[in-house]
Regions:
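N-terminal active-site beta-alpha-beta segment that forms phosphate/nucleotide-binding
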Residues: 1-77
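Conserved phosphate- and dinucleotide-binding cores of soluble alpha/beta proteins
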Residues: 3-7, 58-218
């Protein structure tokens, strides 16, 4: 069965490493903060000026003065700091954020990402995504495998305006975990109950498949 958004975030949380600085983009990535493995200390940074972001608050505990870049209410951990956007982007552009988790509309087999504009639709701008993809050493994309029309978002080449080139290292979707290699998308894991054939059918790029593909463990 395909994963839901929370399960995608739960799987991505398994990629987090102890004592690292992580930025979570808008959408599915913001859910990752709810699934930190035990024994792992992570400093979550939000580009609107938060370092030490915690999980989402319980209903009734929301503080309207504490929000993430997607305007969602958040919690902060002990020792958290708040600062202006100039300081936030100095952290990002200075490569002090080691991992960025972003949503996307398309990802290509060479690691290009398109996640800020659909032609013909009004948008306010690309936000901080271009700074993030140009600065982080490790970028993981969290998204659905196909769009609402059933068209694959895993492509040989992006068709939408590009946010960054050759930057994505791994993609986690509702169907699969994919690693981007020099030769294209390598299938690492499949969602529970989803077959390799179903993943291939939903992918508009060639897949590197080596041996038996394990199911994700959540």
């Amino acid at each position: 069965m395909a994963l839901d958004k929370n399960q995608i975030a739960q799987r991505i949380a398994q990629e987090l490493q102890h004592n690292t600085y992580v930025n979570l983009g808008i959408g599915i990535p913001t859910l990752v903060a709810n699934y930190i493995p035990k024994g792992i200390d992570i400093e979550f940074q939000s580009e609107n000026g938060v370092l030490g972001m915690g999980p989402f608050p319980f209903e009734g505990d929301e503080d309207p003065d504490l929000i993430n870049a997607g305007k969602q209410t958040i919690t902060t951990l002990s020792g958290a700091v708040l600062f202006d956007s100039a300081t936030s982007f100095a952290m990002i552009r200075g490569k002090h954020v080691q991992l960025t988790v972003l949503g996307a509309m398309e990802v290509s087999e060479n690691g290009d990402i398109a996640n800020w504009k659909i032609p013909g639709k009004m948008v306010k701008g690309m936000g901080g995504a271009m700074d993030l993809v140009a600065s982080a050493d490790n970028i993981i994309v969290a998204m659905m495998h196909t769009n609402r029309q059933g068209e694959s978002k895993i492509l040989k080449k992006c068709t939408l305006p590009i946010t960054g080139v050759n930057c994505v290292k791994k993609v986690v979707t509702n169907l699969a975990v994919l690693e981007i290699t020099q030769n294209g998308f390598k299938l690492l894991e499949k969602a529970p109950g989803v077959s390799v054939e179903e993943i291939k059918k939903a992918t508009a790029a060639d897949l590197i498949i080596e041996g038996e593909i394990p199911e994700m463990k959540l």
